[in-house]
């Protein structure tokens, strides 16, 4: 799976999202670019599970040096290495070990039930808090420190995405 030719955005308002970790999983997979495969990075040793399909936007470079992280709200989990055309609706701002590590929240373009969702304001506050709590707990259990700075709406996505695309070029 060579991602070098895959654009970060297939068309305006959408991103290409590569799933690394399906919703409900304790297995943490990461894309190994030099081999073009997903590898098992570690197994979380607690009851904490990923709340949504989690992955990255290819051909981007976030402040932490890796591709820009993204999550997609799905009714059913997909699988590691699945390509999803997704519509960003907001950003979870957090700092992991003192460095900014924003996470884009998306809905799948292929799900007509989510056609009308265009903003995190349309997502239940409890669901957004579940995502934030996952990252708090996940890092704490690993002995790390994470601070959740809060959610920003869809208007914050494009500047972050553009910055990460420019950093990758």
Model-derived segments and spans:
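Hydrophobic N-terminal alpha-helices or hydrophobic patches in metabolic proteins across all domains
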Residues: 1-169
